[in-house]
Each structure stands twice: as C-alpha cells, then as structure tokens.
C-alpha cells in the first residue's frame, strides 16, 4: 500500500502567514490520520524577495504552533535538497526533456513585444495570452540563438480548445476551458523555474501522493495536470482548500487583519488555541465541539468534513477561544506561560538598550515601555490633536503612512523612516509633524523611547495593527476618501 505523503511549500518572502499555517495544519492532519509523512519544502526561486531570515521565521512559527515535519531543509531526508534554489540542474533536465518531446519551446519575445500583444488583445476584448509567436521556430534556429547567448524563456504548449477536467477531492470534477490557459513560462530567463514546473517536478520526485493547497490555485490546475501528462507521471490527488476570509468575506489580507503568525505569538495567544482555531476554519469535529487539541483533530480528521464556504478568520472569536484555553490551564502552567511570553530573553534584549539609559529604578520601566508588552492600547483621542493639522489631515497622513508601511518588505528602522519621510515630503510637511502622531498610535503616550526604534522592535503586523486602531478611533476612512487617498499614495515615491 502506498504511503500517504503530503507537503507544504511556502515562499520565504516575508512574515510567516496564517494561511500557510492553516494549509500546513490540514496537510499534517491528513498525513498523520493515514499513517503517512508530512514534508516541508521551500519555494525560494524568487531570488529578489526570498531570504534565509524569512525561511527561519517559517520554521520557528510552524514549530511554535506545534507543527512538525518529517523531511525538510533543516531536518534533511532522502528526497533533498528541499530548497528549490538548490535544485536548478534538476529543473533544467526536465525542462530540456519537455522541449525535446515537443511539449515546450524556447521563447525569445521581448517584454515590450509581449506588452504590445496583450494591449492589442485587451483592446479587442480578447483574453490576454501568449500568441505563440516563437512556438514554430525551427529548432536549429532556436538552438543557434540560445548558443549565441540570446535571452529566452521556456514555455509549455497548451491546447487551444476543449476543457480540462480537474478532479478535486472536495468539489468532484471541475471543468476548466483550455482557452483560459496561457502558454505558461516554465523556465525564466535567469535559468530558474517558475512555480508550475518546480511544483510538478518536486511533487513527483518527492513522492507526494496528495496535494492540499488553497483554492486560489484551482483556476491554474490544468497547467499542472497537463505537465503530469507530458511527463507520463501519475498525478497526485488534488484538494483545493477554501480560502480564509475577513469578516466582510473578502480574502484575508494584512490591510484588514493581522496575517503574521508572529503577531499572534507576540500578542500572547497560546499556540494550542491558535492551532485549534485554524483547525475550525472550514472543518469541525464529528461531535461539533469547539475546543480540541492537535492530537484530537488528527484522530478524528476526515477531509470530507471540510466545508467549501469561505471560513471567516475573526479576531474576536480567536480571542474567545484563547480565553477558554487560558482558563483551563493549571495555575502553575498559566504562570509559566506568562513568564515565557513576557520575559522572552531575545525580545527583552531588543528592548533593554532603549530603556536602560532612561530609568533610575526597575519600577520605572513599566510606565516607560509597557507598550512593548501590550496588544491593543487604550488610546486617548486628545493625543492626536495637532497644532498644525486638521483632524481630516491627521487621518490622511496616518492612513498614507499605514499604506506605505504595508508595502515595506524589509522591516528596518531606516526603511520605516524612509516610508514616513516619503509621505510627509509629498504632503509638504516635516517629519516632526508626523512623529507626535506616531508616538500616540504606537506607544499610547506623548513621549517614550524612540518611536522608530519601537516600530522596528514591535514588528510590521503589530505596528500596522496599532495604526489601524488609531485610525478607527479617529473615525476611520470613508470609501470616497479611500479612493482619493489611494490615488495620492500611487504618486508617492
């Protein structure tokens, strides 16, 4: 009997996302329930955005939740390497095989030509897709151009008509027309694979039997299915999980909800409660109980109990469930958990240099730096009264800074300062006009340690959470203002 093998394959391009943990949990439960294995693979072919720091954060966040893997970059295994950036020669071998079989072709089209083709197709109300310009190039001519060092990608061929039947474990057979599919790039000009080729090759070579992934990948499933067909490989069973949603039913995003696992760790949620809550996202225990452990979920796990309705990720419900877990802890365990959270040595070492020179006794630390150990703050609207700016201008300035910070990929003091500076200069203001508002939103005080240092230490999700909290206190942003201010944001360098 074939051993069930599932996997999670996150990209190390930012803070570890709750959506990653959600999909990892269901892959883990499915594998364990069937006596199988769960693999962690790192999809780091985006060399510009991928970092080892983000990779380590993924490891740490999943382990904090209690999610462990049988094979992966840090634990090894018989199917390594488990980082896609270390498997380049493997992908090239299989890309060359597809070209040799006539299932793929080198494409030399420039970005300018592709833009022109797509613009013309859109003007004609056609689906934008590659027009096959290089598909019928003479193979000898293509090889001559490659040998001469001409920049190119490798594209897969796809049918131009008919439908692809996608067998989904949750939805049954899903029919997707082939004319919606583009001739997908498989190998980029830099010699690295795209998601589609790497995904299929790795899943096959690593013996993955079941793929549980987010439903946002369902529309592109025909490309993956066609690649399995081209290689002559058995396709793993496919299961497209419902996406996590905000309370307003929109896709979970950092604009409306903190999405980083590290945010919830820093806020003082128990990992057991967080995992329990993620387990209730679109799934329920047979007896409908709300509180259950990972082992209990594995014992009773049945993929057919997954509901296709978009599960709502609601902070209030998560907090309620966390409270249930906290209240059932023995007092000694509760005290130990508080100590582990509040007196985290690594976190304290980040804070200590900014506090040590400003206090004369330890008792002065809490009033000065207590905000480092809080989640939501009790804000006073009077702190946002500005000598120079009207209330509307205050909201606009803070909203633009929040949006600008949302686009920041590397959370460092200099880059945070640069974001704020860019906004204030565009509004013809000074940095000193914004800093009192930042102090108020981030620390809940008129003054404290350097607010820029505080923002770096608190991290992106908690910083943005507090800015959103302050904006809500000041009345929020109307739909009309959002439209107008987003246009303004686009013009800020």
UniProtKB/Swiss-Prot annotation:
Binding of Zn(2+), residues: 107, 109, 134, 136
Which coenzyme or cofactor does it need?
Zn(2+)
Q: Where in the cell is it found?
A: Cytoplasm
Of the GO CC terms on this record, one is: cytosol
Cofactor stoichiometry and binding? Binds 1 zinc ion per subunit.
Q: A Gene Ontology biological process annotation?
A: glutamyl-tRNA aminoacylation
Could you say which protein family the record assigns here?
A: Belongs to the class-I aminoacyl-tRNA synthetase family. Glutamate--tRNA ligase type 1 subfamily.
Identification of the protein by name: Glutamate--tRNA ligase
